[in-house]
């Protein structure tokens, strides 16, 4: 049986469809320096030599700091972490109009993303005829079966799959009204949403002269993430916390425009890191504190960070992601999760919600019972 990792809180701290982009690999990245890789999408792809973000120290990868947070650390800045914990304590049940309602209100926690995100969240459990079906492995099922879950917590599904037009980095894209419609069908208004998990590593993909390289990929992810956060506040104005995750390893070197490939899956984690750093450093474009001016973003931090190098355990915590164990391979793109992969990723997210001070005040029932 494959070992399942119990991740401690320091890690927590964090797919989908893309537009086509291609180009030659960067000559200064030894892992990408060879001529264009033979395009392939299967389990035969071995370790690339690229390091997980969590395993990199100062100036440790192409001159860029590693670590999930500034100063090559995997632990959040103390002031920023304390702010997140304080915001978490301010989250209360809201009625349809967004006003506090401790009796009939809801604490709504949902996601931004599409098929891979939905698999982790709900496991396609409302359609057992789908190719991938994880009815008990998913986050929603496991969270709602906790004895100490907050009884006012609501975990609705949002977007289920890409329609070919979705772009969550564009505030005018149909993704947003479609997400609102999906929530409305479950009795949820935009004013009730307070927490989101954004599993969206396709932010900003597009063609360019540098091809598949760092820092270009990371900058695309960072800038797209900022635009997404602005759109979130436009459509869900009471959102206070957003957890950000980049994608797991992709057993594909073919940028075919359908899903995230390598090395973008690897590089995009730096983009999330840089967006969080911008907020920690006080960038007005990501301000969450009304005492410091106009609020332009929710408070952000890492959700689960999934990337490992083609099944090689991470030095930081031993996490592995393997093909075919964790990846659905039958009639697949080798990117969607298998039920075992859903179980692993949902477990990481659930573990964070049960331990992270930015989550426990609203996720768990303070009385200890449901």
Locate predicted features.
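N-terminal secretory targeting modules
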Residues: 2-8, 23-112, 116-134, 366-370
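Bacterial N-terminal signal peptides
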Residues: 10-23
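Conserved SGNH/GDSL esterase-like catalytic core that processes O-acyl groups on lipids
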Residues: 63, 70-71, 106-215
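Extracytoplasmic/secreted proteins, especially bacterial periplasmic and envelope-associated proteins
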Residues: 119, 123, 131-134, 138, ...
